[in-house]
């Protein structure tokens, strides 16, 4: 190193003349091979001059590998660096540098080291890398030496060492005696989201003179990252988070970040603000005062010296400073609340635009300024390589990693995004599905209420008093109903095993064929234009002796449908509104008739809108499975409680009853038979699970008391209403709601499975507990197998038990629309006073209640002597009734449509008392089916 300085000094003294005296062997080559020629030790120092090396021309090695072109390129650089006012003159005047730490060396020595590194052609383009960056002394020396050593290792292959995984410690070049050394240092890294630190291992590859002879080099012992203390770690993290928040914040808040960073207090900023910036500053203060701002509070404390941010507008404004157009308290509170609601990352309102700096203009400006500069500088910058080519030979690498590039298998697990054929196929399939949905009108109104499934019995073609129903019928156009006053009724037809029914929605659901499902629904319910209708009565509206007043208008086209057995003197009837395929199913009081469940076929109206609901005679007869589950053994809980006062027939209802015999026993059907009387104007309930091949069983005497003898009252649960025998009173017309048009006779329809999903109509009160008991005919316990239940049903059927006779009164009318969505969901059953109760079906065979076990062996009771359920009474609680005209709910029946071979029953359960008190549910709480039961049903 000393010889290089002396040679340059002599060249400078000679004024750059061509005849200047230089060292004979190496003076013209500059200092390329002289770096590190003398041993450097930590005791002496790296820049100590030796007199012996100054006189001995052989003390420095001679560079043998540089060609003539390299020498020609290096000469002008030497002339440039050493000519004129070269700082080397000042440096060479100092005779010795003894015990000089590299950290304390003058900057001129560092510049000289950079020049020495740049003399090689491989390192020359890196001049800008060192001279254009703001580097401190340690970073400067580190970069100089590491880049020089790396480039030298690239140009010349190092001496191979077995299993050497790092840079080589020795070099084979005679003129490059500097080796390499790696230093490891564990430091802590900053984390932007908190105070936690993560240890990081930093490895620095350093160069050393004479291979591994010396432990220290130009960079050894200089680049040391100090460990940061916990307090400094907290401060640095706080300032880092503040800078990040400023970069992400809206533009109007960046001024306040700068003012706070400058040490200004919030009060000083407040009194110096203008009118237009006050609201923004209040929002900024609100953001500063967020409780979870740990780092921002630390940043604020470090900048201002205050422990936390305060509201500066609460202090008195100085008199000397004018305060024009002051803000009101409301404006201040709103602005502060907006600041409190901002995101913790940065003060930004939701409607603030995100400003992205456009680099195109800045690049154009820089390009124009660069064009005005020296062209040579631009060329040198263009020649700087982006990455240095370095492919060192790694020894000891396992052979398993030596794989050819062509042998690598491509990923075949995911589709290629550039293959548009797959995308087009998916889009075409989606387009077909969308077209199928648009062709079929939406049959399900947007209803939040769950649905109920009722299975319909087969069609009976025997003539009745009104004559047989016409086989050919035409479809009634479906009329969409208003949202809050509709009850959804879904028709769902199942097919027997072995019978291929094209329209079986259950099969389509199992196959998950949405296109075929839409086609079948389109055939069942063709799109028709809507017809204007008068105001309709809300769905599932129970009127009459229930004490319910309905302020809805009656429907102009009532249609009969089915329901569970009605109480003795006051039967019920469901009439869906203008359904395309519905059945007229009525209920009446049980009696000692010989045939159970006669088919209801009312009088044929001349203009029947439901004629097309029946299939043609040529079509194959539909076979209906037995989907319903069995109900409890004894008929005590099955018997509905009669109402306290009778109600006359509805003026618009003139049904006629026809008895249809059934062949199999009721034990095989999984249900206890009810045998209504065929006399009187009341219509009978048609059970929906009766197959088409049923015949009438032989008439057998019933063990029950004759209908003319009133039954003896028995012990009942506490609070149960006293049932009365069915009185024989003349029919009295029932009152209709005010303003309702005179309803017309119900049209003739066919039995069809349907689903009920009620929505609570406004202005109605809920039904009484008798209606709920009629709906919940199977409130028994779970867990018992169905064998006992079937045996009990067979014994009852063998005994020929029949219920007592009820007075023939008109049926109650319940209206509901009809549509086709194949959905099975639990619903809510409304108790007395409009209280909702959840109700669902279960596949678990249930056991009779405690009351039923007490009465076991006594024999069936007449329907008028059935006390209410103890379970229902214990779990019941009263809810205040809604006044007239208030919002209420309608009762609803739920049955689930299950697969073939399964049985159905109705279960009644209740939630715990504390749950009812908390939830505030209705009169009687009924348990809903569990997830396993629901999935089993589906």
Swiss-Prot record:
It is found in: Host nucleus. GO terms for cellular component: host cell nucleus. Residues 840-849 have a biased composition (Polar residues). It comes from the Viruses. Residues 698-713, 722-750 have a biased composition (Pro residues). Residues 1-92, 360-389, 431-471, 560-626, 694-767, 834-870, 919-938 are annotated as: Disordered. Keywords: Host nucleus, Host-virus interaction, Transcription, Transcription regulation. InterPro entries: EBNA-3/4/6. Residues 69-92, 431-440 have a biased composition (Basic and acidic residues). The keyword Ion transport does not apply. One of its GO terms (biological process) is viral process. Residues 360-374 have a biased composition (Acidic residues). Pfam families: EBV-NA3 (PF05009). Residues 575-594, 927-938 have a biased composition (Low complexity). May be involved in transcriptional regulation of both viral and cellular genes by interacting with the host DNA-binding protein RBPJ. Belongs to the herpesviridae EBNA-4 family. Interacts (via N-terminus) with host RBPJ. This is Epstein-Barr nuclear antigen 4.
